Each structure stands twice: as structure tokens, then as C-alpha cells.
Amino acid sequence: MRDHLLDEVKGNSIFIHLLAINALEVAPPLGRLSRFATVNGKIDVKTQGTRLFVDIARIYALHCGVKAVNTEQRLALVGQRIKRSVSAIQGDIAAFHHVQTLRLQRQLASLSDGESANSLDPYALDELQQRILRESFRQADSLQERLKLDYKR
């Protein structure tokens, strides 16, 4: 069934285009002067973090007919198909892993602190973690720019 659906979607440029428009509605939470763009001092690491990578990997996988089902595999395989450099692909995967790790840590902490499971105060992180998170969001931004070039016509 998955193969049949993949074949149907692969040739449907309107569907892929609509998925791309939807994926581009959420931008990485990067503000001016190397600040995070927060709401009430927090970022949603699911919506503004992992979703950015998951959506883009899924869109390109559907477009390219890639059968991988997890985001890391999709990023690796579609990265090759869309001619991203090896270092860019590695950066995409590392950035996704970092944001996903922060999200999982936040979800675990929410069990004891009662706060929202996906709501993260980026300034509560140490300086190194903040820098890595910023770079992870820049990597997501790079993927979104590529998506805009390929689908937002």
C-alpha cells in the first residue's frame, strides 16, 4: 500500500506544492542580532524545531520517491537526490538530532516540572547549547530556502 501511495503522490506536483506551502508557514525561531525569536521567552521545539526538518524531509522523499520512513534516512537519501553537499547533508542530520534531543529532554523534564512538554526557554541553556541550537535553526533555514526555490513558484 505504501508503494502505491508513493507512486500516486510522486507524480502529483499540486499536492507536493501544497505540502511545501504548508511547511514554509513556520520559520525557524531566529531573531535579530543572534537572538532567538521567542513567545513569552519560549520556543516550541516541536513546531518550530523538529517539524521543520520532518516536513522538508517528507516532502522531498515523496517528490523523489524515497521509501525511507524516518527523518534521518530521508534527509540522507533526499539530500543526495537534490544534490546537497555531503557536509550539508551531515549538517542537516546533526541539526535535526540536536533539536530532537532537546525536545526529548524537555519532554522528560516536563514530567516533573509540569511545564509544557515542547516549550523550551533557549536562554536556560548554557552558551554552547545556545550556539548549537542557533546553528541547528540556521541549518533548518537553509533547507527551507532550498524548498522555496524548488516549490514556491
PLM segments and residue spans:
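A nucleotide- and high-energy phosphate-metabolite-utilizing enzyme signature
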Residues: 1-153
